[in-house]
């Protein structure tokens, strides 16, 4: 898919990776850019159109797809995460329910709402922001990892379903990204600007998957018995 001249809708575009996507898209010459956010007044980036959007609200998602009928690129970026003390933490169940509503059901809602829009506008694309914990889940991220694994499965099914209809589906796998949400983690983090750029490069090349950092590449290789994770 060609970014220049496209019309994009980015969920959670008011901060972090979503904001990085918005800036990168503007820099690449999108025709129009919608920012799907819960509070449109909190969007300060010049050049984007704020749209009230909550992935947990089916009516809001449907309304956004209806009012943004010229979209050709959907980026499902909105997400939530929180650490557990362990996989046996009683809070895992409640956390998983909360995370599923946004990280999994939210992607399904947005994809189902916007797919007819993309089809109506000709060739289009969907980018789903996933994680490296899709493949390797540390105990403190057990609930979060489960929701991202579920989202990965849906992404793969969606790709098969719409491929012959002209819609490209790209899965973004990445580890910790340097945003306000990861500020408390003392780990190596990726620059959100580089992640956004690498993802859009992959989209324009027609890829189905992008591994945005070295750790994610290593984790994917570890799925092979010949390259176990260490």
Please give the residue ranges for each predicted region:
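Active-site-adjacent segment of SDR/Rossmann-fold oxidoreductases
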Residues: 136, 157-168
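Conserved mid-core segment of classical short-chain dehydrogenase/reductases
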Residues: 81-97, 120, 140-143
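Residue(s) in the substrate-gating loop at a strand-loop-helix junction
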Residues: 131
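A short, exposed helix-loop element centered on a Lys and neighboring polar residues
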Residues: 111-112, 156
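C-terminal helical subdomain
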Residues: 171, 179, 183-221
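Rossmann-fold cofactor-recognition segment
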Residues: 46-58
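Active-site helix of classical SDR
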Residues: 14, 111, 147
């Amino acid at each position: 898919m060609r970014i220049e001249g496209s019309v994009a809708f980015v969920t959670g575009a008011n901060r972090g990776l979503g904001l990085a996507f918005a800036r990168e898209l503007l820099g690449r010459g999108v025709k129009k850019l919608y920012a799907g956010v819960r509070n449109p007044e909190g969007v300060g980036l010049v050049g984007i159109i704020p749209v009230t959007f909550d992935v947990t609200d089916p009516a809001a998602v449907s309304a956004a797809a209806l009012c943004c009928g010229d979209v050709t690129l959907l980026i499902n970026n909105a997400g939530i995460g929180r650490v557990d003390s362990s996989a046996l933490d009683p809070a895992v169940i409640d956390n998983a329910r909360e995370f599923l509503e946004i990280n999994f059901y939210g992607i399904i809602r947005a994809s189902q709402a916007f797919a007819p829009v993309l089809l109506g506008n000709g060739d289009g694309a969907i980018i789903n922001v996933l994680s490296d914990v899709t493949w390797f889940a540390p105990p403190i991220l057990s609930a979060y990892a489960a929701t991202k694994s579920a989202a990965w499965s849906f992404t793969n099914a969606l790709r098969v379903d719409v491929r012959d209809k002209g819609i490209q589906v790209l899965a973004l796998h990445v580890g910790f990204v340097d945003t306000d949400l990861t500020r408390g983690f003392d780990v190596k983090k990726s620059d959100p600007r580089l992640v956004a750029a690498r993802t859009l490069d992959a989209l324009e090349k027609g890829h189905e998957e992008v591994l945005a950092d070295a750790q994610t590449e290593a984790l994917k290789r570890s799925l092979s018995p010949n390259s176990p994770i260490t």
